[in-house]
UniProtKB/Swiss-Prot annotation:
Source organism superkingdom: Bacteria
UniProt entry keywords in alphabetical sequence: Cytoplasm, DNA-binding, Transcription, Transcription regulation
GO MF entry, a single one: DNA binding
Family membership: Belongs to the TACO1 family.
GO-annotated biological processes: regulation of DNA-templated transcription
Entry keyword annotation includes Transcription: yes
Pfam families per UniProt: TACO1_YebC_N, Transcrip_reg
Name of protein: Probable transcriptional regulatory protein Mlut_12910
Upper lineage: Bacteria, Bacillati, Actinomycetota, Actinomycetes, Micrococcales
Amino acid sequence: MSGHSKWATTKHKKAVIDARRAKAFAKYIKNIEVAARAGGPDVAGNPALDLAVSKAKKASVPNDNIDRAVKRGAGLTGEVIDYAEIMYEVRGPQGSALLVECLTDNKNRAAADVRAAVTRNGGTMADSGSVSFLFERKGLVRLPAEGNTEDGLLEAVLEGGADAEEVVLSGDSFEILSDPSDLQSVAKALDEAGVEYESDELEFVPTMKVDLDASGARTFLRLTDALEDLDDVQNVFSNVDIAPEVLAELDED
């Protein structure tokens, strides 16, 4: 019986990983389609498309998928791709706040899906501006803490002629924060220094973080999981900090 249980658990974990991988691929594909629609299919003459394609390749999105997305976005397949960007503001448990970034071809569907996910999982929809003021738009490069140091990363960025506001240790990762306009120069400086990084994105970073207890963390994680599972949701940003001892308690559930 235990063997069957372990196999079922393994299958479930694989299904979760596969679903997240598919969702990540869909996110990159949408970004490619939007960039191709706005600036055409020529990567050399469309910097936004060049960046979107580069990120997709770094995430191991298959080349065939990338090529089809470029053609769809540029209108070369006869399909009409018209996405709208929408930001929803959400209040979570124990003073937590979330920004839900959507890229959708159906605003009504996106609004209904987000509202349902929020209300069913312990959150409440917030008025525009009532949550977003708690965040700042930043360039953010994530890389593993192992093998790197704060001083070494700052030196690599500065020697590459880029500007970084700060380097923050977050769990087992370093985060290099910059002005949004400096993000690509920071990433380029790291590339030139031979420093490998996991991601470089524009994100909404909280000006202050909120600590949650185990009960609040359970609700928060259920809420964010429900939102991130939605097809129209590209990103979920929050001001939450879950302490290691709280995470350890959740692991015992």
